[in-house]
Regions:
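Extended, highly charged linker/hinge segments and catalytic-adjacent loops that couple domains
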Residues: 166-169, 176-178, 329-415, 451
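Conserved short loop/turn motifs at secondary-structure junctions
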Residues: 11-12, 110-115, 194-199, 288-297, ...
């Protein structure tokens, strides 16, 4: 018998990341890949990248010449379909990806662009422009550690699973184009009708946000100050001196937010009270009520930006940039562009692993150790809730040890996230809210103070 042996060569998988640095991280996680030009290649994988957006929707004039003129007569501009045009500065990168996609060696494609709507759009536009017909899968990264990358490769999402996100991304892009192009040209034409050219930009997000700022500014300008008086008194007791503030015990809430129990609207009324109680003895009574204060939920991007602005004066853009560096460069935080403040319900073991690393490597280690030692880290729906997460969960540490010294601002954001991650497992703080009411000549004065109550 004669046998013919045919060697079958397995195809390669092309992985497309959003930026070169992420492509490098993925290539190192896979292992065994060599740098070839601007991509990485091995026996089974080719890892390449975009540089952000490589394509954009065409300008109106490219659909119909007259639509390029900025006048009311040529509005609205509503194409029957949207076409793509390469972005000039990144055309070389697009051509490189086209070549890889058309390679006979490549038999499937993995989308490893950022795990969100914009990353999905970047990849989908590349697929549309290159007319790719090869099978597509999605690498959905929650963090950039080697372990997280390899785990994501074990749980690739199908093209069908990602279609709703792709549709949302394209719809958002086309809506921005329609509102931006038509709104900007209409407002510019209106403001330029008496001569000149007065560019007036309009945007789907920009313009409503501007309206919020304008409304607030109008309220500030129309604000009419009203003078009011308060009466404060110092009371001497054996233990020292305490201060009380006059209030009207018969006060009832009004629809006027300026009216409050402690406010007096005539100077003579305040003076009358001061004269009546000066140098007189009073009777004091106290009532205390226990209260608790729980840690707020884990951070999403918006709450992290607010906190960083409040504590450090960082702008929203600065905080995002720092968090992105801690995610991509340092691998210390999970994906930052999230709107979720909870974790998956099966994440308890992972949380304990992360806290164990934090306990050994962070300046906050003693607090992480206590949380683990005293069994604070337990399942609770406030923290672990699948209904409160979508494509991403809350921003938390990855459990990776810092491999380089963080900058001052990076350390601040990392510590902020780590503190919240530890604190959310601690039991609520316990307080006593005390009200001390002092009555002098039938006038009431109030002192409110809060003190921590000891735990059993």
């Amino acid at each position: 018998h004669k046998y013919i042996i045919i060697g079958l060569k397995m195809g390669k998988t092309l992985v497309i990341a959003e930026k070169p640095s992420v492509a490098g991280d993925i290539a190192r996680a896979i292992g065994g890949l060599k740098k070839v030009g601007d991509h990485y290649e091995g026996d089974s994988y080719i890892v390449a990248s975009a540089v952000g957006h490589l394509l954009e929707l065409k300008e109106p004039a490219e659909y119909e010449v007259k639509r390029g003129k900025w006048s009311f007569a040529n509005l609205p501009v509503i194409p029957s379909h949207f076409d793509l045009a390469p972005i000039k500065k990144s055309e070389t990168k697009l051509n490189g990806l086209k070549k890889l996609l058309k390679s006979k060696e490549v038999d499937k494609v993995i989308n490893a662009c950022d795990a969100g709507r914009e990353g999905e759009l970047i990849f989908r536009y590349i697929m549309e422009a290159t007319k790719n017909k090869k099978p597509i899968y999605r690498l959905w990264l929650q963090s950039m550690t080697k372990g997280a990358i390899l785990d994501a490769f074990k749980h690739l999402r199908t093209d069908a699973q990602m279609q709703p996100l792709a549709d949302a991304a394209k719809s958002r892009s086309e809506a921005d184009w329609l509102v931006g192009i038509n709104g900007t040209r209409a407002m510019t034409a209106f403001n330029s009708k008496d001569g000149g050219f007065f560019l007036t930009t309009v945007g789907r997000v920009q313009t409503p946000t501007l309206a919020l700022v304008v409304n607030r500014e109008e309220k500030i300008r129309s604000f009419a100050p009203r003078n009011y008086w308060e009466v404060h008194a110092d009371f001497k007791v054996d233990a020292g001196v305490y201060e009380g503030k006059y209030f009207d015990p018969d006060f009832k809430k009004s629809s006027d937010p300026d009216l409050k129990a402690e406010r007096l609207w005539a100077a003579e009324d305040a003076q009358k009270i001061a004269d009546a109680v000066r140098g007189k003895k009073g009777t004091a009574t106290e009532t205390s009520k226990p209260s608790t204060s729980s840690c707020p939920a884990l951070y999403d991007l918006t709450t992290l930006q607010r906190e960083a602005n409040s504590r450090f004066g960082f702008s929203a853009k600065t905080t995002l940039s720092i968090a992105q560096a801690l995610y991509e460069k340092h691998k210390l935080l999970t994906y930052p562009r999230t709107d979720a403040r909870a974790l998956p319900e099966d994440y308890l073991p992972t949380v304990k692993e992360i806290l164990s690393v934090v306990a050994q490597t962070s300046s906050l280690g003693k607090f992480a150790q206590k949380a683990l030692k005293d069994n604070y880290v337990v399942f609770t729906k406030k923290i672990f809730n699948n209904a409160k997460i979508s494509d991403h969960f809350a921003i938390i540490p990855t459990g990776q040890e810092p491999k380089s010294v963080l900058s001052e601002v990076e350390q601040k954001i990392y510590d902020l996230v780590t503190k919240r991650f530890i604190a959310v497992f601690y039991p609520p703080a316990q307080f006593l809210n005390t009200t001390r009411t002092t009555v002098v000549e039938d006038y009431h004065f109030c002192l409110l103070y809060t003190s921590p109550s000891p735990r059993d």
